From Swiss-Prot:
The EH domain (1-93) is critical for vesicular localization. Disulfide bonds: none annotated. Residues 194-429 form the Dynamin-type G domain. Homooligomer, and heterooligomer with EHD2. This is EH domain-containing protein 1. It comes from Arabidopsis thaliana. GO terms for molecular function: calcium ion binding; G protein activity; GTP binding. Disruption phenotype: Early flowering in short-day growth conditions. Slightly slower endocytosis with delayed internalization. Reduced Brefeldin A sensitivity. The gene is EHD1. It holds the Pfam family DUF5600.
Amino acid sequence: MEIESVAAGSCSKENQMIYKEWFEFSDSDGDGRITGNDAIKFFTMSNLPRPELKQIWAIADSKRQGYLGFKEFIVAMQLVSLAQTGHEISHEVLISDVDFKNINPPTMEGLGVLMAKKKHSSKSSDPNMNGSPAADTSLTAHWFSSKSSKKISLSSVTSIVDGLKRLYIQKLKPLEVAYRFNDFVSPLLTNSDFDAKPMVMLLGQYSTGKTTFIKHLLKSTYPGAHIGPEPTTDRFVVVMSGPDERSIPGNTVAVQADMPFSGLTTFGTAFLSKFECSQMPHPLLEHVTFVDTPGVLSGEKQRTQRAYDFTGVTSWFASKCDLILLLFDPHKLDVSDEFKRVISSLRGHDDKIRVVLNKADQVDTQQLMRVYGALMWSLGKVLNTPEVSRVYIGSFSDKPINEAATGPIGRELFEKEQDDLLADLKDIPKKACDRRINEFVKRARAAKIHAYIISHLKKEMPAIMGKAKAQQKLIDNLEDEFGKVQREHHLPKGDFPNVDHFREVLSGYNIDKFEKLKPKMLQTVDDMLGYDIPELLKNFKNPYD
């Protein structure tokens, strides 16, 4: 399975050299990214009408990053060339039989003269050849050091993600630090959290086909993969792109600044010893990272013998992931207590959840209908949402579908379901930037509510006498205190954190040491949500809108 068409963006070496010169010429600030104004100046030389240029930008910037890297620039130039020769420009052209590799560069009126004038000036640095912003991450990494956080200029923001980093450091992070949001809800964000590739997490009871599912998508096994009928995967494995095939231990992964897993250190060495990263070169992993999880156990005793907080780890990954696949087996439809807790920990991420009924070719059509009904019944008691979750039925493995059980109708159904699921996965990189904005806004709202709760608890404490007794009373009646905060500030009840978890963390703190309400700080976050983020999206939208 390919996330993007291989043809678009590939070209001969001669054409690549031409495009490289054009890219360097049009990239006025030499940061390896062509943004709105640069694009308008350069693309105008093609003499194409504005609606066609708008469509070309939309297709080239398919991930909606707000800029074109070198690879996206090549795609744009190839589309310009096609438009000049009379082709209709649409998304379908990428999957058509057009020979992208041998498309001649487009005609750009007056470009040769302008480039000749610029020849005497020093050449700008080489752009990142693969189109990803990896070369630019070092430019923004130093923003996260406390000394430089106040000095980030607006001109240094060259993408939507850069803009989110700047807003986080200058406006949201001070609120999180003041009210200890990182201790109660989620660790502070780092540079790598913003630059990470989209992630897909697979959850399910043992032997429901999680590892086989990843193997099926990659069309090869990954380092450290174990497949069998018994509980084989005994650890959390992140499968991501890398220069060679290797497994990296969890403690090493957690301290690497270029990986978004530093927040996992809060779960301790017991968890990190059950966590590893598998790297391998693969075109699919250039766009998506997979998280393979241990099979959820069915017995309460096995759960209590885990040395780490399995539900907490799952919840941490859920907040980082773009898609969560719950895998079920027709022979394992019971939702165990631990699985129920795991699904409950996904609260707030309902839009990411997809249910997969795997190994469906192991039962005949009549049994499959009954199994599907039983699965819906089981999930209805666990997923406390009125909306229906999308359920995919199929057999996601390299083995041919067992037609003896399902018949030709079953085969056709499974193939259509597989196509739908693959289409969902293909959409992930395209929606990654939108998802990042969505998660950022969600985090900002959670931080605001957290600040209201903490400042309210501080306000309820006595000035001098009886502090210990007052603190215990507040902790015991925490649900009532949440209700007071909700009514006082007119907040939605569903946005409040889990009471039991909050109580557990709160019991280790002295409420009297907490900060009072700082209206100015909260107003800054409100302004960020109301004005700064819409302005950021406006600045990096399609320049031809």
